[in-house]
């Protein structure tokens, strides 16, 4: 009988320990849920539609200076270290051709901390005003870019009308 009593007490103590650990795990999960609730929306890639990006200036690979969004209809942010970026360049150039968006209306910002342009830059220089800047450069900061690739469609006033990770999913641009 004493062995049976000891076994019941041991099982009871083990159940209490398990209950305490479960409460600890639940508390931690609630903390993580609160942290994740405050995280960046995965659909939010930068300046939200309806808002205008901040002021910026960039110098293109051909030496032209682009200041702000005046005259721009599409702005693309690509990265030299992004594995998806080279895959998105052909759909991006097809989007520009399909909607007849001229080179002067498109800015492609390539983020490269070392300043070395990626191989896909050669596909962009004829269809966009392309510039290479650091990841925290003026244009990326003005558009509040949270990841790469990022594509922004702008209206005549320079406000963002749409944004996305995939250029082929972008809506048709408004007439300029």
Where does each model-flagged region fall?
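Long, leucine- and charge-enriched amphipathic alpha-helices
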Residues: 1-47
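N-terminal "domain-start" segment that seeds a small globular fold
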Residues: 34-66
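Short active-site neighborhood of thiol/selenol oxidoreductases, capturing the structured segment around
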Residues: 66-92, 108-109
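Structural motif
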Residues: 77-80, 109-114, 134, 156
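Structural microenvironment flanking redox-active thiols in thiol-disulfide oxidoreductases
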Residues: 91-125, 137
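Short, internal strand/loop/helix patches
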Residues: 122-150
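Non-catalytic, surface beta->alpha helical segment in thiol-disulfide oxidoreductase systems
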Residues: 146-147, 152-176
């Amino acid at each position: 009988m004493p062995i049976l009593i000891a076994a019941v007490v041991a099982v009871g103590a083990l159940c209490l320990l398990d209950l305490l650990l479960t409460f600890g795990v639940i508390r931690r999960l609630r903390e993580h849920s609160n942290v994740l609730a405050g995280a960046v929306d995965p659909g939010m890639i930068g300046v939200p539609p309806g808002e205008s990006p901040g002021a910026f200036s960039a110098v293109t690979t051909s030496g032209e200076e682009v200041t702000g969004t005046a005259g721009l209809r599409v702005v693309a942010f690509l990265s030299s270290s992004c594995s998806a970026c080279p895959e998105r360049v052909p759909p991006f150039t097809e989007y520009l051709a399909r909607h007849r968006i001229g080179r002067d209306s498109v800015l492609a910002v390539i983020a490269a901390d070392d300043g070395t342009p990626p191989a896909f830059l050669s596909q962009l220089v004829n269809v966009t005003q392309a510039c290479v800047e650091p990841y925290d450069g003026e244009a990326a900061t003005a558009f509040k870019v949270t990841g790469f690739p990022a594509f922004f469609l702008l209206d005549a006033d320079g406000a963002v009308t749409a944004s996305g990770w995939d250029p082929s999913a972008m809506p048709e641009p408004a007439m300029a």
